[in-house]
A protein has these predicted regions:
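Ser/Thr-rich, low-complexity intrinsically disordered terminal regions
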Residues: 2-71, 76-119
Length: 119
């Protein structure tokens, strides 16, 4: 499952507070972050995402979960898009947004290394 851990002083609550809808076009694919939802314990955010690659559109959520050492961005079990380059790239972009919260943040465990230089 594609994921990226951002270690350091980042929080899902700050991500939610500063969130704005975004759209990128990368290598012909359209990547969108449309909305985000903070749960009542303030430890998890669901980000509504859309990827359009060619004629195929996929709508799904990206889960941000607060951990002791930082935040992990991944696909929740209830959403199951095809793990295309665009889906992986968008999860990496969310990791990049988390990392930008504080200069002390860094990438931790991930299987998205090829996409992290783009975020």
């Amino acid at each position: 499952m594609p994921h990226v851990m951002v270690d350091g002083p980042c929080t899902v609550e700050q991500f939610h507070t500063t969130f704005t809808a975004m759209q990128w076009t990368v290598e012909g694919a359209i990547l969108k972050l449309r909305d985000c939802f903070l749960n009542t314990t303030r430890e998890e955010v669901l980000v509504e995402a859309v990827v359009v690659e060619g004629k195929r559109m996929q709508s799904f959520f990206i889960s941000l979960s607060q951990r002791r050492t930082g935040v992990i961005a991944k696909l929740p079990i209830v959403t199951d898009p095809e793990k295309t380059e665009g889906v992986k790239r968008l999860i990496a972009c969310v990791g990049g947004l988390l990392k930008q919260q504080n200069p002390a943040c860094r990438y931790g465990q991930t299987n998205l290394h090829p996409f992290l230089g783009e975020s």
